């Protein structure tokens, strides 16, 4: 994981699984290699193995459950996604919230397994406290902006700048900005405000030409870090 970080969360859209997901992943892989910018794909658990076999990009889980090995029907464990080929996982996404003690447990297990961790928080006040648990990155997403097309970098730039101030108190942890990021200009502003990368979902997954959206994000990110 290195800046500029771009993570695309596939969620559970029509094109999030099966051949459609693989084809999208291959298109993103091609653009990623063209610009030498690594893109992380966070996919449904049922797609981790196939995506990791057919797409040459880091595949992350969208969520893992904070339960041990044992009698937990339907649970998706860190050990399972690791075995399926995942390189990391999202933790505590706004659509899959965990308690603080559960986050601590999951982070300990992902570290032990060698999985990268992207911990999601919904406000900047949580950045420093959760940075003490040493995730690889913290993704800040005001939930009211998720999926709206109104980006955090435009609507609430102070959320990013304050989160940047908080992340600087801990060494070696990246800050990723998410929620409503739709255009290349949103990406550019987020990185210029101090974020190390961006997290997106619907802007790519619901786009008519997702590869063009991804290319716009990459070129905007590169422009931000080089200017």
From Swiss-Prot:
Catalysis: reaction(s): D-glyceraldehyde 3-phosphate = dihydroxyacetone phosphate
A cellular component annotation (GO) from this entry: cytosol
PROSITE patterns referenced in this protein's UniProt entry, alphabetically: TIM_2
Role, per record: Involved in the gluconeogenesis. Catalyzes stereospecifically the conversion of dihydroxyacetone phosphate (DHAP) to D-glyceraldehyde-3-phosphate (G3P).
Pathway field: Carbohydrate biosynthesis; gluconeogenesis; Carbohydrate degradation; glycolysis; D-glyceraldehyde 3-phosphate from glycerone phosphate: step 1/1
PANTHER family: TRIOSEPHOSPHATE ISOMERASE
CDD domains recorded: TIM
Keywords: Cytoplasm, Gluconeogenesis, Glycolysis, Isomerase
Family: Belongs to the triosephosphate isomerase family.
First-tier enzyme category under EC: isomerase
EC number(s) on file: 5.3.1.1
Subunit structure as annotated in this protein's UniProt entry: Homotetramer; dimer of dimers.
Database matches in Pfam families: TIM (PF00121)
One GO MF term: triose-phosphate isomerase activity
Catalytic residue positions: 93 (electrophile), 141 (proton acceptor)
Keyword Oxidoreductase attributed: no
Protein name stated in the entry: Triosephosphate isomerase
Organism from which the protein derives: Saccharolobus solfataricus (strain ATCC 35092 / DSM 1617 / JCM 11322 / P2) (Sulfolobus solfataricus)
InterPro entries assigned to the protein according to its UniProt record, in alphabetical order: Aldolase_TIM, TIM_sf, Triosephosphate_isomerase, Triosephosphate_isomerase_arc
Keyword Isomerase in annotation: yes
Disulfide links within the chain: none
Taxonomic path: Archaea, Thermoproteota, Thermoprotei, Sulfolobales, Sulfolobaceae
Swiss-Prot/TrEMBL GO biological process terms: gluconeogenesis; glyceraldehyde-3-phosphate biosynthetic process; glycerol catabolic process; glycolytic process
Gene this protein is translated from: tpiA
